[in-house]
Amino acid sequence: MLLEFRDIQIEDISFFENYWKITSQRASDYSFPILWGWAGDYGYQTAREDDKDLLWIRQTVPRNYDLAPLGKWKRDDWAEIIQKRFGKEAEFWLVPEKLLDLWKLQLGDILEIEDMRGRWEYLYD
């Protein structure tokens, strides 16, 4: 299945919020204000997959980086979904821990993980 990515627009907030609400672990890097606000610098794009309740996110500057999707993470078909949309050599950046745990269970040894300790969430009081 070919995903149709398009640039993030301010009008996308309406459908974006639906995916945000059903995401198991929300990270600030994936919030609409961050993605939309930095879209000019990082070329953020989204592709909706309504039948799977997933919103795929991609960064296009300085090169293409596939990011974790928002939406329904609790599913048992991740291996099939990723292979059909991204192929056998898929590479994802900034995958939240809860999604990574699901992928570890379902993808097993084919998954290579690189911990990026320089990237972390800010905590505010």
Predicted regions and their residues:
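Acyl-donor-binding surface of acyltransferase catalytic domains
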Residues: 70-125
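N-terminal charged segments
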Residues: 1-83
